[in-house]
Amino acid sequence: MYYPLSSSLMFFILFSLFYHLPCESSKCESLFQCGNITASFPFWGGDRHKHCGHPLLELRCDQNKSTSLFISDQEFFVLHVDQTSYSLTLARPDLLHSFCSLTFTNTTLPPEIFELSPAYKSVTFYHCYPVLPDLSNYTCPVIGPISVSGNPEDHETCFPNFAANVPTSFVTKEKKLNIANLESVLEKGFEVNMNVIMKACQACSYSNESCGFDENFPFEVKCKPHHSPTDTSLSIGAKAGIAVASVSGLAILLLAGLFLCIRRRRKTQDAQYTSKSLPITSYSSRDTSRNPTSTTISSSSNHSLLPSISNLANRSDYCGVQVFSYEELEEATENFSRELGDGGFGTVYYGVLKDGRAVAVKRLYERSLKRVEQFKNEIEILKSLKHPNLVILYGCTSRHSRELLLVYEYISNGTLAEHLHGNRAEARPLCWSTRLNIAIETASALSFLHIKGIIHRDIKTTNILLDDNYQVKVADFGLSRLFPMDQTHISTAPQGTPGYVDPEYYQCYQLNEKSDVYSFGVVLTELISSKEAVDITRHRHDINLANMAVSKIQNNALHELVDSSLGYDNDPEVRRKMMAVAELAFRCLQQERDVRPAMDEIVEILRGIKDDEKKRVLVKSPDVVDIECGGGDDVGLLRNSVPPPISPETDKWTSSSDTAASL
């Protein structure tokens, strides 16, 4: 039957389409303003949309009207912006106060965006033993003597600690630094020049357009038209072209709206007919008798509420999992009233199927293309994986469902995060042996994924579930990627959770297995410290747990990092094992991904730590400074002794828990 499109509906469609067009383009005409800082291209932030500037150059304004820029995993205060010379003055917040109180880190900026002004120079701070008289020296109360050089030389007794930028005039003719004024100089910041393509931006201004960037990688400058309804500078030909284009666009939109309206009505009728005529039967390529409540989906229908996932319903070889109706999952979850928490791209609810199985049902936040792709991605990855430490996917809803839902086994004991620093931590804290088992099982699951060519990309303690026996179930594969075996990396925009993202992936947009290794290093640090990966209530140098851990280990202060309630202070055996795990975490958290261990090696190291009852555990690391954590029983960090890695079997697995997870 033909249904004419009502005039009110057509007006709404056209209005909604055209109403927002001038708003988006006009946002690029807005300036970022904060205190005494005013900026335009290539920056964005505030009233300027992200597409109006370089994706990495977001300016932020705090309550004190101070402007900041977060780039290369470091925060910088923006003291001055010169749009004429395309330069700006930056200062590190951690250098604005007492020099000796900071956690030493290098000043790093992406060279494709910034270059240090010729008026400034990078100087290196050293630890020298003994102190060399030909270098400027400065003594910090806790750290001890620090030597500074504007022109570093090869001193066998000196080890570089970190680098910072100072004016060239600060370096004397004798190539030494006037260290007495070091703090005041660092507070004034340093100047950098922008390397982004400014000529392309000038070309935009010639055509009365605004500068912006596309969302592809590598980023390219794009000219975006201004919105100016009163602009009379257009030629008659240009105006005629615009008029013709507008009329053509209007005609296309009218036809498209008419087509969509008719199609939606037909789909609604087809869906109603299908739901009434289909019998209740089993649908599972693995077990045809396990759940009598599932629904057989008709493969003869050619219509789809979501065409991008239409083959989920009529291709059992695509899903390989059971297909549930929306109504039975709505009933199982008591109308989605028993919320368990967030699950990456959806909310997770507790439910009980008619056959008695307890399940966790993930409900998509929204039906955007990105969410649908994550929905499909999780099914595609989990359907073919079997491992005792990976969560089991029972099934999903069909294309005729009102909403997209995923159905998993229910893991009753919460997340690892809840047990380490959440609402379960105080009631029954995890003992050290349990934490070590959790580390081994998580590493085993990741090693299995890497063997299968899969990068998880979002390993964190909230995605590590625990059953009643504290056996690990790694979950949430919405961001996971299949990794081609013949490639060294995948170029993709960084995704993941702050505090867990590999800094090299963040800076270079290159993803590989070692990105998971870095995230796992953060998890190891949480296991030994019971601290959150990111905690803004900590000292500003310790907000990021990974940075805090590396600093504490490098400065022989592991006792300030670990959870003393685990027996670190009074049990020598626990102390040695915790130090060995800390050493392994230190290797995983290295900035250079090439020096991080592979997951199969990590599994063997952790098993060696668990099985060692009397020997001191030593962990090797190539070309990393040898640091000892003080004390007679301390183990030297990162020495050259480690069991040789072996290739894990893909079809035989051992678990540190005696009992499998109960459903």
Swiss-Prot record:
SMART domains: S_TKc. The active site is at residue 458. Its main location: membrane. Residues 290-304 have a biased composition (Low complexity). It catalyses: L-seryl-[protein] + ATP = O-phospho-L-seryl-[protein] + ADP + H(+); L-threonyl-[protein] + ATP = O-phospho-L-threonyl-[protein] + ADP + H(+). One of its GO terms (cellular component) is plasma membrane. It is found in: Cell membrane. Belongs to the protein kinase superfamily. Ser/Thr protein kinase family. InterPro entries: Kinase-like_dom_sf, Prot_kinase_dom, Protein_kinase_ATP_BS, Ser-Thr/Tyr_kinase_cat_dom, Ser/Thr_kinase_AS, WAK_assoc_C, WAK_GUB. This is LEAF RUST 10 DISEASE-RESISTANCE LOCUS RECEPTOR-LIKE PROTEIN KINASE-like 1.4. Residues 282-304, 637-663 are annotated as: Disordered. One of its GO terms (biological process) is cellular response to hypoxia. Residues 1-25 form the signal peptide. Residues 263-663 are cytoplasmic. Residues 26-241 are extracellular. The chain crosses the membrane at residues 242-262. Residues 334-609 form the Protein kinase domain. Its EC number is 2.7.11.1. It is a single-pass type I membrane protein. It holds the Pfam family PK_Tyr_Ser-Thr.
